[in-house]
């Protein structure tokens, strides 16, 4: 499995390490995971607090773009978190036009089917988008 990351790093040019969720008792600590099945590439992105009704996504060439906002809670002086990014897939190995996207209980699932007969190894690039 290969992951390439393109982000706007801070002034030091270094990418900050993710902070471990001390309240999480089991499971992966990663904010996102990319896995391969026999028929597809499945990406899991944690977007806690975001309702499915707020998800916006679209497919553009070999890119899958997504955005969602956690609702603001003024009574707790919380403006809500905003999430968004793009996943770039190899168009020679994946049928990106047939991508399926679901947001279930604050977890975004992006499923991109493999093109039959093509040797697809996971080489997905992600981009963090700021809007």
Curated annotation (Swiss-Prot):
PROSITE patterns registered for this protein in UniProt: SHSP (PS01031)
InterPro entries: A-crystallin/Hsp20_dom (IPR002068), HSP14.7/HSP23.5/HSP23.6-like (IPR044656), HSP20-like_chaperone (IPR008978)
Biased composition (Polar residues): 1-11
Keywords carried by this UniProt record: Cytoplasm, Stress response
SUPFAM superfamilies: HSP20-like chaperones
Domain of life: Eukaryota
Organism for this UniProt entry: Arabidopsis thaliana (Mouse-ear cress)
Classification lineage: Eukaryota, Viridiplantae, Streptophyta, Embryophyta, Tracheophyta
GO cellular component term of the entry, any: cytoplasm
Occurrences of domain sHSP (ranges): 22-131
Annotated region described as Disordered, given as residue ranges: 1-20
Cellular localization per UniProt: Cytoplasm
Main location: cytoplasm
Recorded family membership: Belongs to the small heat shock protein (HSP20) family.
Subunit structure: May form oligomeric structures.
Official protein name in the record: 14.7 kDa heat shock protein
